[in-house]
């Protein structure tokens, strides 16, 4: 409703580091933004991490960005294709975070894409926190040590890293 007003880019840190795939959610009466971005300017490699911050309104963060996930497992750090083709420098990826509440609402969940999207190893990881935990505390988040979706060559599944949750018309299924 009403007239759209372009408010501009949301500044995610004082150095104006690169940030993409932002999404917002409300949890326990507080609006949050999650996104992926760089820890610092790229020099000879790149690491995309997942950040979270609280929001003052839909276009302004009200807290510093907090790193809650960075690529650490081998399955999150694949950037070379099976044929040897690769990017010019290593790129380790946690990106495209999507928030989801567990069915009984006792867990806050963030699904994210991991590894290079240009590889068949692109997959989906999962972070979970207790629903009553401080979501800005990195220690609240537990990372699954294995991907929740990954390639399965026997069934011709390659690179299932894109994440989207769509409810059924009656809202009972996702």
Task: Pin down the residues of each PLM region.
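Carbohydrate-active catalytic/glycan-binding domains of CAZyme proteins
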Residues: 1-174
């Amino acid at each position: 409703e009403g007239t759209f007003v372009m408010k501009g880019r949301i500044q995610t840190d004082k150095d104006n580091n690169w940030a993409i795939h932002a999404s917002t959610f409300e949890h326990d009466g507080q609006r949050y933004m999650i996104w992926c971005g760089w820890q610092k300017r790229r020099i000879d490699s790149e690491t995309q991490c997942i950040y979270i911050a609280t929001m003052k309104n839909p276009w302004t963060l009200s807290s510093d960005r907090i790193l809650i996930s960075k690529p650490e497992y081998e399955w999150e750090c694949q950037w070379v294709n099976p044929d040897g083709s690769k990017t010019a420098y290593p790129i380790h990826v946690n990106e495209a975070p999507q928030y989801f509440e567990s069915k009984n609402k006792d867990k806050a969940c963030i699904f994210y894409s991991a590894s290079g999207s240009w590889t068949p190893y692109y997959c989906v990881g999962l972070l979970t926190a207790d629903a009553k935990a401080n979501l800005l505390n990195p220690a609240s988040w537990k990372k699954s040590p294995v991907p929740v979706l990954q390639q399965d060559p026997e069934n011709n599944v390659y690179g299932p890293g894109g994440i989207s949750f769509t409810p059924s018309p009656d809202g009972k299924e996702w």
